[in-house]
A protein has these predicted regions:
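Key DNA-contact positions within bacterial/archaeal DNA-binding proteins
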Residues: 45
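Base-recognition residues in the alpha-helical recognition helix of bacterial helix-turn-helix
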Residues: 24, 48-52, 59-60, 64
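Amphipathic alpha-helical packing segments from all-alpha helical-bundle domains
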Residues: 67-70, 115-141, 150-154, 178, ...
Length: 196
């Protein structure tokens, strides 16, 4: 039983890895399930067993990449001078990841088109909870205005996500990026108890 579970986990990881490459290179619509499975020596049956269908595989890939993005953004925030600067750095880092071709294609373009509203994705819900906890501490410490913490967290995360979506969909992402980050910082600054 343990060996079977281990084989299933390995097959799942192989399929996610192959899908990341195929979805980034060809896009979701053009990526063939047969090419995906044969690239890692598995059958369509393995894909269906692990993910239900191609859409389920995309959801697993998006969840993995989006979780990596959140972790990377949190690392950027941890390097900032204080918790407020950390919150701003996390949002800016998330927006900047829209320049990564894999993130751009899979998470910000194909993900919403196939999976729907990103704010409903499990990885986004997890990120929202982390932001809400940070906001609660900033309010308690007097750094932020005493607004509803969940509302503020949802607006901050939504602003970063929508800025990243804008960058990804733009014909000139590198030109749009600084504008998006500047506007995100200005919007967030409105939540400060004592504006900079």
């Amino acid at each position: 039983m343990k060996k079977r579970a281990q084989t299933m986990a390995q097959n799942r990881a192989k399929l996610i890895s192959a899908a990341r490459v195929a979805f980034a290179k060809k896009g979701y619509a053009a990526a063939s399930m047969d090419d995906l499975t044969s690239a890692v020596g598995l059958t369509r049956g393995a894909l269906y067993h692990n993910f239900g269908d191609k859409r389920g595989l995309l959801a697993a890939v998006v969840d993995q990449i989006d979780s990596e993005m959140a972790s990377s953004a949190q690392q950027a925030g941890a390097q900032a001078g204080d918790e407020w600067q950390g919150l701003l750095a996390e949002g800016a880092a998330y927006i900047e990841m829209a320049l990564d071709p894999e993130v751009q294609r899979i998470v910000l373009l194909d993900g919403p088109a196939v999976l729907g509203d990103p704010s409903q994705w499990p990885s986004q819900s997890s990120c929202l909870q982390v932001t809400r906890q940070t906001v609660e501490r900033l309010i308690a410490g007097g750094t932020m205005k005493p607004v509803d913490a969940e509302a503020a967290a949802r607006l901050l995360n939504g602003a970063a996500l929508n800025a990243a979506l804008w960058v990804a969909a733009s014909t000139s992402p590198k030109t749009v990026l600084p504008k998006a980050v500047e506007a995100f910082r200005a919007l967030a600054g409105g939540l400060l108890a004592k504006p900079d």
